[in-house]
């Protein structure tokens, strides 16, 4: 299990970074006047997070094939890959909203933020599939 996490170093770092940033108080910024800036931020943050996960999944798959841990003929694109690259980021976004609602006094959980997280993950799906197929080759 631990050796697999080493292949997903950037994803682990991003997970910890997103968790910390989402639980800290929000500083005032001139961008507060931009309508829906919070939702745009969630879409970009989780879209980027999911896309990095797609890239690291492809690189992990490629190294597994090269090391002989996985046969080349097996389908590399399957349900478990979608569960990892789509399911986990959406679940993580929901978990963050629950943590914001229950553990912080400076933040509040918001269903629209969760929806924005999911939209970001779906946008990453559109970019992630071709990226995955390119990197696995």
Task: Name these PLM-found stretches.
Residues 1-137:
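Bulky hydrophobic segments
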